[in-house]
Design a protein with these regions (language model features):
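Conserved class I S-adenosyl-L-methionine
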Residues: 102-120, 141
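Conserved AdoMet
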Residues: 2-108
Length: 271
């Protein structure tokens, strides 16, 4: 697929999926590969043929939508974010929970890919923070639209490149080095519940002290869908809870009841 054809096709189809072209500039070639594979499977010869196919087969939009999700993740991605979570956010939330007589901190990792983000959070809590708050238990819900990504997260086995940002001592302590790669130990998997879920259609019923929504809604969704998603996230946050977005992402304009905790790290607090 030539780039000019791919760009024109994405600029046509993405708005119909409530996605925005600007979020796909850097990852568009990965989407091209998926679309090209789909064309071959359908016996189509060009993106023009595929566009015609979409117009006569509305069920194909679901397939195209799934082709537009590009998981890019690794452990401890954006080191400064996890340092701020360690030094400020999680201790503050733990103290808040203690003051309310609670024994559980609830976290939600959205677009968790193969589990790198929620497991990083589990490592951070168990290796750096838990000793300060021995009566507090961290539980993490990790969701992703991709059932194959969730299956990989359940296996918990990763190539060395996924762990390159982790402190060396954490790799030694929390992973078994196997022939397949680095397998995270069960005690660090235990706090994490993995679930296939599309945030555009379903959100959990419970509320959370910490929500991480990085490099998903505020990169790929269009303005209206971003605003709707943010309203739902705020509704699912505890008062005083924290929302973490991706490096370089911005929240949509409007009154959502959030105040900056660290704008540099993309962390906000529900007022």
């Amino acid at each position: 697929m030539r780039d000019v054809e791919g760009v024109q096709f994405l600029q046509w189809c993405l708005p119909r999926l409530q996605l925005r072209w600007s979020g796909y500039r850097k990852v568009r070639r990965q989407v091209y590969k998926r679309i090209s594979a789909r064309l071959q499977l359908l016996g189509l010869h060009s993106v023009a043929d595929y566009r015609s196919y979409l117009e006569t087969h509305p069920e194909e939009w679901e397939v195209l939508d799934s082709s537009c999700w590009i998981p890019i993740s690794r452990f401890y991605r954006d080191k400064g974010v996890f340092q701020f979570l360690e030094q400020e956010v999680l201790p503050s939330l733990a103290r808040q929970a203690l003051a309310q007589g609670k024994s559980v901190l609830r976290c939600w990792s959205i677009g968790c890919a193969a589990g790198e983000e929620p497991y990083s959070l589990s490592l951070l809590w168990k290796l750096k923070i838990q000793a300060q708050f021995p009566t507090i238990r961290l539980v993490i819900l990790a969701t992703d639209i991709d059932d194959q990504a969730i299956a990989r997260a359940q296996q918990g086995c990763y190539p060395p490149s996924s762990l390159k940002d982790l402190p060396e001592s954490w790799r030694t302590q929390a992973f078994d080095h196997t022939a397949e790669g680095f397998r995270i130990k069960q005690e660090y998997q235990e706090p994490v519940t993995l679930l296939v879920q599309d945030i555009r259609r379903t959100v959990p019923e419970e509320t959370f002290h910490l929500i991480l929504c990085r490099y998903l809604a505020f990169t790929y969704f269009d303005a209206a869908l971003q605003s709707n998603t943010l309203r739902q996230l705020v509704e699912r946050m505890q008062i005083g809870g924290a929302l973490v977005i991706g490096n370089g992402e911005t929240l949509p304009e409007g009154e959502f009841g959030l105040i900056p905790w660290s704008e540099k790290e993309g962390i906000y607090r529900r007022a």
